[in-house]
């Protein structure tokens, strides 16, 4: 079977399974199966697949048809122009989270020597990206999951990003009295009440504790905010990714913060909140 024939067959199966973005999935998984780039697929469409390549592609397509995210099948996802390892132990990095990185870039000069904490680091995409974009930052990252931290540590090592990692339930492992110049987080913020609106591949395959934040999506955030306040220096910044339905409740929780603002994503949906701890 040629590359084109294999692609066309896979596309039909993915469409029949009502897979989101079937053409993209077919391409990504064919590149994965052949260990090639997209240009290769278009340059050699009549090239015959080997038996091993065909078997690998068939298995990948079958997994995708059952809802498994393509990123878990390939083990990779791009974030802010860098390749990150992913596994079912971590939330898949999303383009929306890049708005948090952009918000940090708007606040901080590249040469700052700030101490920064990433809470709930998951794959480490935020922490490692900040360490690369701000080489003088001292970045610490925490997560409750040891399995997630293994992925995060591997990503930092691959990218040569200097990050200190700790297992921690929110900020519980941070020393009393230790304070940071900035704390960032992409906490679980989807409400259980919204579960019927969440894609099957997210509900069935991504870590539940990294997606859902209680009935209304606020349980973790309500615990997180006072801990962040305690561990931020006066004048320090807090940036957090949020969902479209919780901007107002988050604003209420952060009513004592200054410089509060909500940063929308490209669709105009509230995506990142920014607040500053008063200097006095």
Curated annotation (Swiss-Prot):
Catalyses which reaction(s): L-glutaminyl-[peptide chain release factor] + S-adenosyl-L-methionine = N(5)-methyl-L-glutaminyl-[peptide chain release factor] + S-adenosyl-L-homocysteine + H(+)
Binding site for substrate: 186-189
Sites where the protein binds S-adenosyl-L-methionine: 120-124, 143, 186
Keywords (A to Z) from UniProt: Methyltransferase, S-adenosyl-L-methionine, Transferase
Pfam families the record matches: MTS, PrmC_N
SUPFAM superfamilies linked: S-adenosyl-L-methionine-dependent methyltransferases (SSF53335)
One BP annotation, GO: methylation
GO molecular function, one term: protein-glutamine N-methyltransferase activity
EC number(s) on file: 2.1.1.297
Family membership: Belongs to the protein N5-glutamine methyltransferase family. PrmC subfamily.
General function of this protein: Methylates the class 1 translation termination release factors RF1/PrfA and RF2/PrfB on the glutamine residue of the universally conserved GGQ motif.
Protein name per its UniProtKB record: Release factor glutamine methyltransferase
């Amino acid at each position: 079977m040629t590359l084109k024939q294999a692609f066309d067959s896979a596309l039909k199966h993915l469409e029949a399974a009502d897979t989101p973005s079937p053409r993209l999935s077919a391409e990504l998984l064919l590149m994965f199966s052949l260990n090639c780039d997209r240009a290769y697929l278009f340059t050699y469409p009549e090239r015959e697949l080997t038996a091993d390549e065909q078997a690998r592609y068939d298995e990948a397509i079958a997994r995708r048809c059952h809802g498994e995210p393509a990123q878990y099948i390939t083990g990779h996802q791009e974030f802010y122009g860098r390749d990150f390892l992913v596994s079912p132990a971590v939330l898949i990095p999303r383009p929306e989270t890049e708005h948090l990185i952009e918000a940090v870039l708007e606040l901080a000069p590249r040469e700052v020597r700030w101490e920064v904490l990433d809470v709930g680091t998951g794959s480490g995409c935020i922490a490692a990206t900040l360490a690369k974009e701000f080489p003088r930052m001292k970045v610490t990252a925490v997560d409750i999951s040891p399995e997630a931290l293994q992925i995060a540590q591997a990503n930092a090592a691959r990218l040569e990003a200097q990050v200190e990692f700790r297992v921690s339930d929110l900020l519980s492992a941070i020393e009393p009295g230790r304070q940071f110049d900035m704390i960032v987080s992409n906490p679980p913020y989807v409400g259980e009440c919204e579960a019927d609106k969440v894609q099957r591949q997210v509900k069935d395959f991504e870590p539940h504790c990294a997606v859902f934040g209680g009935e209304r999506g606020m349980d973790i955030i309500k615990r997180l905010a006072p801990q962040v306040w305690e561990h931020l220096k006066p004048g320090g910044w807090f940036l957090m990714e949020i969902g479209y339905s919780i901007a107002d409740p988050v604003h209420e929780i952060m009513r004592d913060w200054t410089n509060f603002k909500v940063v929308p994503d490209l669709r105009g949906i509230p995506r990142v909140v920014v607040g500053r701890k008063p200097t006095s």
